């Protein structure tokens, strides 16, 4: 009988398997070969060097990813898997052993002019496919530290930024507050924001604020320290600002970000009207209180077993495209999905490629509700993206954060739109539309407030240390600008900077705008599909395939979209405006 567990045999049958052992041994050999080739760069032609090093870089990528993915798959389904933890440590050490040699090769590639690169690659498909990869490597090298700077920075980061990250995680995971006689963690309290009982939601929010007040001091030190480290590192690397570095890593122009936020600001009043309408429907007159943002509305008695979920998803996706539906069918049929929650398995959901197999794996915690079906469809969208790029060269499979959620959000739009159109009652339709708008309003209003907060913090941190009260003031100002009169401003959450892990990374600053970009890009693509029909499909697949090789602007251009102007974003927001109008109509009827 199917127990809902994935099959990993296409990767490895175990850590003691011959294949796992041979791949570990081969990775060690590749490390040595890369080291040897790095010493031979001087005195050979660019063509000779590329022909010698690129295949090794490809093999290193394939081996290290396959080995580490298998460890991840094992660890995330069984936290007590000691063999997986041990193997993961060995894999990480082996994967990083060639870092210096790979850095030298990257610097060498960066030293070659574009003209010399073109001449060296001529007639070699195995090299010409990486023209854009080499371009990006040349750009990245301009921001590398000289001498032993990279090694020194990495070592200091362990006791610097990485330790401050751990402090924030430690404080937020350990703090508790009593609610109705029970000591609850911050995560447990935040999850009660979805409780059907309004009094529970309010009490949980008040307890949540008390948690933040207990830990705000050390977490403020963590935030200040991480941001100062990011600012200092950006100065050393030649970036104008922390945001400048973030956009560089995303392969995205500042004009595109400005166009996105410009369109969002135009439509903020529309989203404020959604919050006010929800507040009025729940009996509030001065806007929606913060603790009611996730208050459920409408209802549905519909539940799904995993076979019904499979049938529903495949049916909806087949309306759009046979290949997309077939990919989903195969994932179910060949046990690529670990379905149910169990002891030792992590929460949430993710999709990862199974490198070297042409497959992917999905972890989810399916509970039978429609939201769980949507989560499955979302992750299958990631899987479809992976299937589109699986034939790319090994070095052409990493895409940037802004486009990472495109296919997954597109799948969500397909599924939720179908569900709304086929709702069995107005109450079910209200639930579906309100859930969609909850997510959309977070992508627009909440993410914008996070962006404004981080931008202000980075600007102030250059010459001042911000105590908790100042950080709270910045957060409140950001929320007032983003949420306007849609929320009851006396109930705003000044401590949102404490709990959001996205602020606490020296590697990924401004881990916010990609959510807005991805969400609105997917909705805009869905609207384009509704207009173009079957003609849209080849462009959509080509766009997904090219995301690792092109900038976000050029990727979107394949579908005839200009993301550097406001018009496209206005179209996405206009579609959401129609959803808001439908929501208002339904709550008035109710």
Q: What name fits each language-model region?
A:
Residues 1-298, 310, 585-589:
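A well-structured
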Residues 238, 367-387, 408, 413, ...:
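Active-site recognition of the HExxH zinc-binding catalytic motif
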Residues 302-306, 357-377:
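Short pre-active-site segment immediately N-terminal to the catalytic Zn-binding motif
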Residues 277, 281-325, 351, 385, ...:
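Long, K/E/R/D-enriched contiguous segments that form extended
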Residues 319-326, 352, 382, 386-393, ...:
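Conserved helix-loop functional segments at active or binding sites
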Residues 400-428, 436-438, 442, 518:
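Post-HExxH zinc-binding segment in Zn-dependent metallohydrolases
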Residues 2, 105, 109-110, 135-140, ...:
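C-terminal, non-catalytic "cap/extension" segments appended to globular domains
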Residues 299-304, 337-358:
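Catalytic zinc-binding patch centered on the HExxH motif and its immediate surroundings
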């Amino acid at each position: 009988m199917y127990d809902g567990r994935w099959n990993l045999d296409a990767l490895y049958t175990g850590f003691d398997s011959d294949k796992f052992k041979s791949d570990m041994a081969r990775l060690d050999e590749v490390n040595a070969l890369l080291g040897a080739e790095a010493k031979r760069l001087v005195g050979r032609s660019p063509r000779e060097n590329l022909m010698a090093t690129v295949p090794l870089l490809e093999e290193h990528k394939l081996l290290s990813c396959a080995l580490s993915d298998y460890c991840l798959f094992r660890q995330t389904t069984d936290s007590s898997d000691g063999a997986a933890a041990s193997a993961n440590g060995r894999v990480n050490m082996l994967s990083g052993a060639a870092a210096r040699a790979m850095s030298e090769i990257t610097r060498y590639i960066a030293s070659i002019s574009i003209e010399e690169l073109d001449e060296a690659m001529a007639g070699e498909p195995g090299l010409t496919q990486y023209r854009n990869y080499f371009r990006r490597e040349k750009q990245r090298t301009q921001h590398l530290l000289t001498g032993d700077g990279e090694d020194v920075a990495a070592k200091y980061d362990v006791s610097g930024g990485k330790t401050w990250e751990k402090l924030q995680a430690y404080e937020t995971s350990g703090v508790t507050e009593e609610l109705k006689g029970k000591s609850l963690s911050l995560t447990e309290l935040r999850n009660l924001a979805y409780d059907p009982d309004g009094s529970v939601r309010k009490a949980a929010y008040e307890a949540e604020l008390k948690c933040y007040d207990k830990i705000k001091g050390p977490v403020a030190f963590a935030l200040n320290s991480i941001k100062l480290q990011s600012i200092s590192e950006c100065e050393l690397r030649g970036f104008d600002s922390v945001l400048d570095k973030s956009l560089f890593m995303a392969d995205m122009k500042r004009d595109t970000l400005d166009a996105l936020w410009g369109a969002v600001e135009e439509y903020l009043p529309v989203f404020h009207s959604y919050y006010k309408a929800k507040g009025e429907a729940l009996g509030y007159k001065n806007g929606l209180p913060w603790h009611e943002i996730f208050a459920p509305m409408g209802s549905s008695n519909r539940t799904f077993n995993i076979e019904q979920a499979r049938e529903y998803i495949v049916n909806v996706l087949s309306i759009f495209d046979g290949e997309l539906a077939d990919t989903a069918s195969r994932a179910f049929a060949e046990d690529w999905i670990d379905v149910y929650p169990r002891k030792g398995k992590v929460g949430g959901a993710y999709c990862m490629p199974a490198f070297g197999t042409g497959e992917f794996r999905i972890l989810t915690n399916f509970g039978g509700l429609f939201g769980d079906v949507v989560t499955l469809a979302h992750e299958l969208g990631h899987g479809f993206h992976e299937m589109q790029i699986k034939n790319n060269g090994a070095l052409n499979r990493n895409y940037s954060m802004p486009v990472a959620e495109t296919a997954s959000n597109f799948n969500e739009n397909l599924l939720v739109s179908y569900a709304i159109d086929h709702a069995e009652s107005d109450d079910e339709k209200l639930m579906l539309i309100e859930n969609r708008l909850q997510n959309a309003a977070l992508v627009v209003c909440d993410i914008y407030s996070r962006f404004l907060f981080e931008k202000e913090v980075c600007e102030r941190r250059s010459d001042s240390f911000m105590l908790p009260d100042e950080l709270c003031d910045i957060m409140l100002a950001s929320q007032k600008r983003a949420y306007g009169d849609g929320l009851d401003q006396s109930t705003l959450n000044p401590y949102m900077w404490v709990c959001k892990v996205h602020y606490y990374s020296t590697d990924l600053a401004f881990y916010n705008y990609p959510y807005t970009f991805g969400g609105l890009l997917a909705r805009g693509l869905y609207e384009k599909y509704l207009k173009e029909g079957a003609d849209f499909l080849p462009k959509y697949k080509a766009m997904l395939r090219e995301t690792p090789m092109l900038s976000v602007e050029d990727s979107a251009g394949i579908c005839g979209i200009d993301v550097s102007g406001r018009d496209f974003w206005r179209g996405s927001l206009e579609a959401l405006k129609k959803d808001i109008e439908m929501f208002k109509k339904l709550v008035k009827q109710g």
